[in-house]
Amino acid sequence: MLSVNKKALEIVNKMIENKEEINIDVIKLENGATVLDCGVNVPGSWKAGKLFTKICLGGLAHVGISLSPCECKGITLPYVKIKTSHPAIATLGAQKAGWAVKVGKYFAMGSGPARALAKKPKKTYEEIGYEDDADVAVLCLEASKLPNEEVAEYVAKECGVEVENVYLLVAPTASLVGSIQISGRVVENGTYKMLEVLEFDVNKVKYAAGLAPIAPIIGDDFAMMGATNDMVLYGGITYYYIKSDENDDIESLCKALPSCASKDYGKPFMEVFKAADYDFYKIDKGMFAPAVVVINDMTTGKVYRAGKVNAEVLKKSLGWTEL
């Protein structure tokens, strides 16, 4: 079986080798663990954001960045593009931000391949039927502070590996790399909703592609949390190839999948978050989805499209000024 941690390590080694070119720093902790600073005390770069995103996806996706008008009328933004032939493993088995790393006063949302070793959360791996037995652990952290030896020891223990085989990549939300990697979750937002909300077997998704605008740096981590979410919810476009069986209603799946099917749709994420008393659990889970969904039912040959790009909400979210 494919090892997302071993695949990711190949990319990590390239980042370490080219650290000066891609504006990152590499720190060797006293216990032997390796930290890659991709935006805390360094600027990062487009290339670092691209590679960070690819690592999040367990090395099982193509990641590209371009400047494209796409469907966002009146808004010009860079876009991240994702293509994968292993959608369930890459997005849910690796990329999903399913590990809240809390050690002492340190907190970060963890995503990427190491989750497959620690089985965070276990149910996800049971549902997609995937496990990794690598002797290295690669974890991506969304945080504004770098982890210490204690954090690395915790990750090593949870993953069942030696601490010197732990690699921790860190990027704040309010950084170029952080913004890129969050928009790079556009395909994962769809597979997440399929599995967690609509209870659809994501192993039937054979190929997937998507693109989403990359949020400008408009403020601190809290402000960027809103902007980065909006890029996917109101600007993300996805395409899924599904091998259905006779019991699947793919038309209904497509109709229910985009963010506009949610009762909380229509306002910038920060407004929705505020109305929910800043409690994620009060927000409709169905809102966390791409703006546009296209599904090719490979069994019937039919193609369905649902959702829309909402340029007005994107402009409002970013405080867009047209001169």
UniProtKB/Swiss-Prot annotation:
It is an enzyme of class 3 (hydrolase). Pathway: One-carbon metabolism; methanogenesis from CO(2); 5,10-methenyl-5,6,7,8-tetrahydromethanopterin from CO(2): step 3/3. Keywords: Cytoplasm, Hydrolase, Methanogenesis, One-carbon metabolism. InterPro entries: METHMP_CycHdrlase (IPR003209). GO terms for biological process: methanogenesis, from carbon dioxide; one-carbon metabolic process. It comes from the Archaea. Its main location: cytoplasm. It is found in: Cytoplasm. Its EC number is 3.5.4.27. GO terms for cellular component: cytoplasm. Catalyzes the reversible interconversion of 5-formyl-H(4)MPT to methenyl-H(4)MPT(+). Belongs to the MCH family. This is Methenyltetrahydromethanopterin cyclohydrolase. It comes from Methanocaldococcus jannaschii (strain ATCC 43067 / DSM 2661 / JAL-1 / JCM 10045 / NBRC 100440) (Methanococcus jannaschii).
